[in-house]
Curated annotation (Swiss-Prot):
This is 2,3-bisphosphoglycerate-dependent phosphoglycerate mutase. Substrate binds at residues 10-17, 23-24, 62, 89-92, 100, 116-117, 160-161. The record marks 159 as: Transition state stabilizer. Pathway: Carbohydrate degradation; glycolysis; pyruvate from D-glyceraldehyde 3-phosphate: step 3/5. Homodimer. Belongs to the phosphoglycerate mutase family. BPG-dependent PGAM subfamily. GO terms for molecular function: phosphoglycerate mutase activity. NCBIfam families: pgm_1, PRK01295.1. SMART domains: PGAM (SM00855). It comes from Nitrobacter hamburgensis (strain DSM 10229 / NCIMB 13809 / X14). PROSITE patterns: PG_MUTASE (PS00175). It catalyses: (2R)-2-phosphoglycerate = (2R)-3-phosphoglycerate. Gene3D superfamilies: Phosphoglycerate mutase-like (3.40.50.1240).
Length: 207
């Protein structure tokens, strides 16, 4: 039986990350730094000897572009790639496109902090982290996890909050714990799973 390997990569820095804007389902591309981060992720995975069988990403360009750059660096652009909005970033609703300082002026520091850091309070017209998990987790369990458990080396390039859903179930974290978990841009996290989908080992390739 092949190893059950799952690699998660948060997209590289986007143009809106750089401008400190709420992004969500808006669709900015990577910055030059983001491109470099994605290529570095591919290089690190190449150094580890990874040969992927399948990859998953969202339908947002910053994640798709990150995946493309990682696979190019690996020389593995021919593998099957599945794209699904289930892996999209949390939808920030009315906050999307606003500078975080502008949002604080409009709604107040405390309210914006609640929207950003609470588990189940959504911003106007948007999703809470709980809502995002409800969208992302079924896709992970039904589509991604079976590939890993079959022994297919699996790569997921997505977003800070959609990847939190995967980390939450893999590491059996509470809502309070997952809220505190930060995923660095362009930093691969490698999970080796047991046959029952529990984590045998984890390796974070940040920096």
């Amino acid at each position: 039986m092949s190893e059950r390997l799952l690699v998660l990569v948060r997209h590289g820095q986007s143009e809106w990350n750089l401008k400190n804007l709420f992004t969500g389902w808006k669709d900015p591309d990577l910055t030059e730094l983001g491109v470099t981060e994605a290529k570095d992720a591919g290089r690190k995975l190449k150094e580890q000897g990874f040969a992927f069988d399948i990859a998953f990403t969202s339908v947002l360009i910053r994640a798709e572009h990150t995946l493309d750059l990682v696979l190019e660096e690996l020389g593995q652009t021919g593998i099957p790639v599945r794209k699904d909005l289930a892996l999209n970033e949390r939808d920030y609703g009315d906050l999307a496109g606003l500078n975080k300082d502008e949002a604080r002026k409009k709604w107040g520091e405390e309210q914006v902090l609640i929207w950003r850091r609470s588990y189940d309070v959504p911003p106007p017209g948007g999703e809470s982290l709980k809502d995002t998990l409800a969208r992302t987790l079924p896709y992970f369990v039904q589509e991604i996890l079976p590939c890993v458990l079959r022994g297919e080396c699996t790569l997921v390039a997505a977003h800070g909050n959609s990847l939190r859903a995967l980390v939450m179930v893999l590491e059996k974290l509470s809502p309070e714990q997952i809220l505190k978990r930060e995923l660095a841009t362009g930093a691969p996290v490698i999970y080796r799973l047991n046959a029952d989908a529990t984590v045998a080992s984890k390796l974070d390739l940040a920096a």
